[in-house]
A protein has these predicted regions:
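A short, Trp-centered hydrophobic/proline-enriched beta-strand micro-motif
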Residues: 116-125, 169
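Flexible, small-/acidic-enriched active-site or ligand-binding loops
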Residues: 136, 194-222
Length: 287
């Protein structure tokens, strides 16, 4: 959808995003994919122009834009062949903190997320035995005085290695002791980077498409009790999941990775065949 047909004021946002994307051509993204690299320069450029803080209220240093404006940002990024994954991740994870975090959590973290001094781009949900069945997750957070002790494993967690903070979904009440399936699961906002080497281990996962995927291990990790965001999974998780789906749709609507292949199918096909052939040649030559 072209949102600027509905609200012409959004054309300025499109133009601004387009200018940022112009400095990051296809070669930049091919290098990122080939090396499984995080697009550091691109993310920094978006942050400098305020796009990663689009939905953070002005009172916390953000732009205070609505979901439609954020959708335009993501769509335009992909329209120009860039990858908006880091941008959309920060938008929806930040939303959980904004809507459900304590005043202390919002005051402590949102201004730093808005100015780029902290990144919140990781959400620890999926586990080896609970892909689509989130309620079956096994990572536990057990209360111990003014701390929780976290034990478990997350997998396919994008950008954990590049994120300062993580939203973590963990079981705080055993599944056999709750009345409703959705009870007993809590969301925490943890200082992930400070916990590396203190019970947290992050390992990269090499995949066909570069999303900076990782698996994250929690080995009796102590986190402060005030990192708890909330315990009502339905209120905490479902609204943000809906926003995430909207963001994914916006990216698909863009003419980047999806639309670019339709606009230039012959060129896209030739590049794909060429890269495949080169890869096969290199593998055979090394034998």
């Amino acid at each position: 959808m072209n949102f600027t047909d509905i609200n012409p004021d959004l054309a300025e946002i499109r133009d601004g995003v387009a200018k940022v994307c112009a400095a990051f051509p296809g070669e930049y993204w091919r290098k990122c994919d080939a090396g499984n690299l995080y697009p550091e320069e691109f993310v920094s450029a978006l942050m400098k122009e305020g796009y990663l803080a689009a939905m953070i209220p002005e009172s916390y240093g953000g732009s205070g834009l609505n979901l439609t404006a954020a959708s335009v940002i993501l769509e335009e990024i992909h329209r120009h062949g860039c990858n908006a994954a880091a941008c959309h991740a920060q938008m929806y994870t930040m939303g959980t903190v904004l809507r459900h975090g304590s005043d202390e959590q919002k005051s402590k973290y949102l201004p730093k997320i808005a100015d780029g001094s902290l990144r919140l781009q990781a959400f620890g949900v999926t586990e080896p035995t609970s892909g689509t069945d989130t309620l079956a997750l096994k990572t536990t957070a057990t209360r111990d005085g003014d701390h929780y002790i976290v034990k478990g494993q997350k997998i396919w967690t994008s950008r954990a290695a590049q994120s300062d903070l993580m939203l973590l979904l963990a079981r705080t009440t055993p599944r056999d002791k709750v009345e409703k399936k959705t009870d007993g699961l809590s969301v925490f906002l943890i200082d992930l980077k400070s916990l590396i080497g203190k019970g947290v281990t992050i390992r990269p996962i090499r995949a066909m498409i570069n999303h900076n995927s990782t698996e994250v291990f929690f080995d009796d990790v102590r986190i402060p009790a005030d990192t708890l965001v909330g315990e009502d999974l339905v209120q905490l998780f479902i609204p943000d999941l809906g926003q995430r789906r909207i963001h994914h749709q916006n990216q698909a609507d863009g003419d980047g990775y999806v639309g670019g292949a339709h606009r230039h199918p012959l060129q896209h096909g030739r590049q794909t065949v060429k890269k495949t052939a080169q890869g096969n040649t290199q593998r055979h030559s090394s034998k």
